[in-house]
Regions:
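Active-site beta3 strand of CheY-like receiver
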Residues: 47-53
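Recognition helix of helix-turn-helix DNA-binding domains
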Residues: 157-190
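Short, flexible helix-to-coil linker/hinge segments that flank and couple to helix-turn-helix
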Residues: 89-147, 200
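Short hydrophobic/Thr-rich beta-strand motif most characteristic of the beta2 strand and flanking loop
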Residues: 27-35, 43, 185
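Conserved acidic segment of CheY-like receiver
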Residues: 2-14, 18-22
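Acidic catalytic/metal-coordinating carboxylates
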Residues: 36-39, 62-65
Length: 201
């Protein structure tokens, strides 16, 4: 019986390449391709995949948000992240979201296929270089600080953030100030840059 795989990737060339690699394997069936997490959630219901293979950075809904939503809904699907981001912070957040596979896009195709089989069988498949780093530096940010800092890093003003999150501007400034202090940053832009570099946003 084939392992049913749904691929989620916003770059068409990478999406096609991953699908082609998996289709070569006799025991895999690519049952769907999505450009973001929102599309993927709709396809999960329709195509009933065993494994979702997703990128992290995508519009509409990131791979980490998709994994967290799959976990929240208790969908019977295993999630593998395939990304260019070799950051322990991302891996830690992925594990917290119930992800059981985390590989880098430059991994050999045999590693990718083996990871799908291992995860489908109930195991884990984590990039060995990242696995050793994952608990070395804990993420100091709260969920709300992360949310506010991500929006600020994307250029939103305190007023914009307050409006979108239904908070007061003073509360938004407090969250940003806390995040800056925790990261040792001089301003919100630097704080967002540091947090992104460490994989915390």
């Amino acid at each position: 019986m084939s392992i049913r795989v749904l691929i989620v990737e916003d770059q068409s060339m990478v999406l096609g390449a991953l699908a082609a690699l998996l289709e070569i394997e006799r025991d895999f069936e690519v049952v769907g391709q999505a450009r973001n997490g929102e599309e993927a959630l709709a396809l999960i219901a329709a195509s009933k995949p065993d494994v979702v293979m997703t990128d992290i950075e995508m519009p509409a809904m990131t791979g980490l948000e998709l994994a967290a939503e799959i976990q929240r809904r208790r969908l019977p699907v295993r999630v593998i992240i395939v990304t260019t981001f070799a950051r322990a912070g991302y891996l830690r957040r992925a594990l917290d979201a119930g992800v059981t596979g985390y590989l880098l896009k430059d991994s050999p195709s045999a590693t990718l296929a083996g990871a799908v089989r291992r995860v489908h069988a109930g195991g884990r498949a984590i990039d060995p270089e990242l696995a050793g780093e994952v608990w070395t530096e804990p993420d100091p940010l709260t969920d709300r600080e992360r949310q506010v800092l991500r929006m600020a890093g994307d250029g939103a003003s305190s007023a914009d953030i307050a409006g979108r999150l239904k908070l007061s501007e003073g509360t938004v400034r407090n969250y940003l100030s806390e995040a800056m202090n925790k990261l040792g940053a001089a301003n919100r832009t630097e704080a967002a840059r540091i947090a992104r570099m460490k994989g915390w946003l």
